[in-house]
């Protein structure tokens, strides 16, 4: 059971939207097993903290459109999953949540492309929101994720890393994403969209 269910949110609705977002192009996969393996990684899920933050923040607003806010939560989760697929490649991980990683099952190249595919699905969902400021913030979050990973790689085994540099890396890789998850609902134009 994910945190979504524990906090009283409609986990089944979330999962249905998540599945629909990714499997809409399932006929494009020449290898049905590959699509099933990708879906297993996505649906096996973790705690779903980022989507939970989207939904919790939405509760601060009255008359929120359920489909729109859950779509934003799914888009956030897909962006996170894409980053995990890529992280598994960088870290040479063989499993995640007791499931063999995609690059381990197929190849590094396939793993990268599957991560990119999931990221694209996230961006497709975000594109439904016609809010330029939101799109700019998505670009900032993605930039921060990339810079944080590059900084981490650059400082690998750097035992003289300053506390400020560590905090900056953590902000880039983690906190900026959490922050975005919390305040995605607070764009004035998004309020109008979700009302």
Q: Can you describe what each PLM-predicted range is?
A:
Residues 1-79, 85, 89-104, 140, ...:
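Conserved N-terminal diphosphate/IPP-binding helix and adjacent helical/loop segment
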Residues 96-119, 160-174:
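Divalent-cation-assisted or electrostatically stabilized phosphate/pyrophosphate-binding catalytic cores
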Residues 53, 122, 148:
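Residue-level signal for inorganic ion chemistry
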Residues 117-133:
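Primarily interfacial, aromatic-capped hydrophobic alpha-helices that serve as membrane anchors
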